[in-house]
Amino acid sequence: MRIAITRIPGKGAGDARICQKYGHECYTVSPLRVELYPDRIREFVDAANRGELDCIFFASAVPARVMGPLLTSPPRVIAIGPQTARTLAKSGIRVETLPAFYSRALVPYLGEWIRGRRIGIPRADVPNPALITAIEGAGGIPVEVRCYRLVPTGTPLATDGADALLFTSGTSFREAAWTPRPGLLLMAIGEVTAAAMREGGAPPAVVGDGSLEGTLGALDRFLQGAGR
């Protein structure tokens, strides 16, 4: 299948290789672009390099790409997935990867270690109160910095040549300009995105585990079940 994948411009590196592995091809469509907050980034990095944080949790490759080269004395660093981990590793940072592709896996992963620790969370200008509440409930101290925002591009998604459209976040779905059409298979990268799509009246036929590979595996199972 030919799959249109929602990505921030420049963030889709490696997608084609992964899709080819599963016998598909893909291209990027961008409903959002990134706008950085440089002052907030510098303040956060300086605090980390001064030892004021016990851990940094990167839930996206965007802050990892920007902050990684600036972290000269990083604390414990945890990435939400392998792509984010690889981005950090390029800067020579020793990084751990969560066993699941969701922020909610962070607190169980840290266990008792989190108690009394300052957990840095560089993220988009989109609230995640559930993560903050979970950290506080486990005795940790969340230090959240909204270091960039996602700005709608307003560009209609080019899906005329696609067999499937994969949304990679709830925000990308909510902000996308696109037109449903018969024959266009809708996909969600994970359950959070799927929930946003269902709420928006566009339920996905395929739901992944939060990763591109997991989604393509789910797609292949769907196609086999449909006899395609």
What are the language-model segments listed below?
Residues 1-228:
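Signature of uroporphyrinogen-III synthase
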